[in-house]
């Protein structure tokens, strides 16, 4: 088994490779240091670390724009407000920035995010920029809610009657279960 710099596995028996999709800050720092030590030779750096050209270019641009800390900040998952997304989209649509340049300027990790925002904005307008709820929807309550507090004496008595019926039903069920339990016990 051979581990690659991408924190993956290369099994010689099956010739299958598994790679994690994200790179940690330490690995990015090593790549940038190698790049700078080798006279900014990007092809050598890509071959040495087995990186895609666009990935290396993005890291170099982030490093040039924000320094070494720029690589760490952009790796975290963030939630962006619809207003922020709209500002980025307007900057790209007005020709002020390309998608890549907007990522560097606004501190966004990947230009693919900006492309998704642009598509959503073109299809649905500002509503496409509002985050959708994630996960399973909440379940309905299984039990009915208690009725509101009674306002009159008659409503108060009806509520008390309802409580007593529920209590009576619980006691009957408990008594029935006890009888079934006693019948199942063998006599010793």
Curated annotation (Swiss-Prot):
Disulfide bonds: none annotated. It comes from Haemophilus influenzae (strain ATCC 51907 / DSM 11121 / KW20 / Rd). InterPro entries: Homeodomain-like_sf, InsJ-like_HTH, IS150/IS1296_orfA-like, WH-like_DNA-bd_sf. Residues 133-153 are annotated as: Disordered. This is Uncharacterized protein HI_1720. Belongs to the IS150/IS1296 orfA family. It comes from the Bacteria.
